[in-house]
């Protein structure tokens, strides 16, 4: 049973088809009721049958409430069970109402509700956010996405190893150093997700990565950002505090300010951000802290604004500070990763350890994490078998190749990453 099914009141019927609505318990419920009435009215005006109108209203209420609770979508089966109906019956009624699309249409052509091929019910806006995000992730992490600032595709494992020694120091013990693993991946890919709890060294890792990049290219344009002003300030202070360990000439090149995501993207009086696909951010490297707070809408806008050649590093704790709005994007993207033999070998060579040793310390594909990676782990890109509506997008875009990770290597298999809906509805 889903969280939505346990916690939500049953979708109401419309007053004007003979069923009284309960008094709204809160604003989101009132909003859902108003939306349900509107969808029912539009369906009836369009000539839909009474049964189709009723299901359109029920679905509108359920989708709106799910979004208010942080879910991007919910299984149609959840709604069907409430009224002892089958998913097939509900799907047919929704399409007959004229208020639902199957998701194959362009954003402008979507109806208010979307029922995808896997039986998930969306508000059209959130379906489009998720679809845009999926396509942007595939395009940005793709090995053929074009030259990437600071991505040293021709760097040998020895070069990477020397840079790690220079800016991370020598290996301290026999344990796998996950900061170094994260650094190798961040130095070798356009999209890197770094998840770890407080004190696991995310900031130290970023400082080292930026030092390695600036050492290779002194004129890199770097931006630091976070979802809130307080988080952005903390990130800036932590980075500058650790910059004292760097050579002065490198420390001086680190960014001296940070931004909120809205300021970074250029929020203004209009509905659209100033930076988007047609006017991308003018940076070579963008580092986002507290990324677990980013919802699916902001993630879609952010990826739209990242130029193909720009490196994006996202830091956060997948177990804390969930997004306020719908879509726990960071938690989904930092789910259990898996690596191919080529990828393991390249990372191991850069670290100066045996590939077998690294492999043994990696997350257990059957479900759990070993102690080390659970505390600190990084991955590039995202898997190709998102068990979600993103699945079709990734399949169409050849995501297995797109998320090869390190240039020239099939680093990230993605075949053992059971990522559920982008959102908190894991059913």
State where each predicted segment sits.
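Conserved ATP-binding/catalytic motifs of P-loop helicase motor domains
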Residues: 2-426
